[in-house]
Amino acid sequence: MKYVKRFRVPPGTSVELKSIDPGFTDHHDGHQAAVKEIEQYRERLRELQELLYADGRRSLLICLQALDAGGKDGTISHMLGSMNPQGCKVVGFKQPSAVELSHDFLWRIHRATPARGEVTIFNRSHYEDVLIARVHNLVPKEVWSTRYDRINAFESGLVHDDTHILKFFLHISKDEQLKRFKARLDDPAKQWKISEADYKERSYWDQYTPAYEEALSRCSTEQSPWYIIPSDHKWFRNLAVARIVVEYLEGLKMTFPPPTVDLDHIRKEYHSAKKHGH
């Protein structure tokens, strides 16, 4: 089965994260066994991004959500290694500024969406406004509970204007999160990532789980689906995300635009330049 279907949250589904194994690796027998397949998808992703850029009629928005140490940065690094930075950008959404808070919660999001021909990757996204806002009571329930429908309407508008949306929840276990926190402590190159807030947020694990489940359940639509990616194994996470993006883009059946010049004339110019050495 194609991954674009296998890990997709069907619209109307009631998600239970405890029923989804974050350590799942499909049939793959470890990282080394999957290296060739991963590289094949990376190369194909590079080709498809060039085609998206040249085609110029559509854009692609990729939203990444995860709990702390879930692998958002690693996934972005893996994808960017496959793409031409000329047509790709990454936007991270942290605590809103005073200016952003003076607008509606989607204002800063809309400004960051991709132009036609571009790929934009959101490191966290508008879903923080139904996740952290809910868990930490940043706004009352009567406010955040209305945001699911507003998010769906917002994404529907983007799709109507030819922005295709893929949303990935990188699903890790609580044990794996703690292992990654330990790895950061042990690696001087990663110690800069350490924050006391990580451990504070970890204490809200049982509150984040239902918040994610409701967002995944209510906001996975036919036109803007969520994908739940088993992410305890970083290599499988990278494989699954790359494969889904490739399968999705291939389904768009994009084509290179026709040349805008007279090729016969250009060929004559070329042969003339070659003949005369200039």
Residue ranges of predicted features:
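A glycine- and Lys/Arg-enriched "phosphate-lid" helix/loop adjacent to the NTP-binding pocket
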Residues: 28, 132-150, 158-210, 257-264, ...
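Glycine-rich phosphate-binding P-loop
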Residues: 63-80
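Pre-Walker A adenine-sensing motif
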Residues: 46-53
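Conserved nucleotide-sensing/catalytic segment adjacent to the nucleotide-binding pocket
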Residues: 28-37, 86-148
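NTP-dependent small-molecule kinase module
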Residues: 208-213, 217-278
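Conserved nucleotide-binding/hydrolysis micro-motifs of P-loop NTPases
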Residues: 69, 96-99, 125-128, 137, ...
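Charged, amphipathic alpha-helical linker segments immediately N-terminal to NTP-binding catalytic cores
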Residues: 1-42
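Post-Walker A helix-loop "phosphate-sensing" segment adjacent to the P-loop in P-loop NTPases
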Residues: 81-90, 253
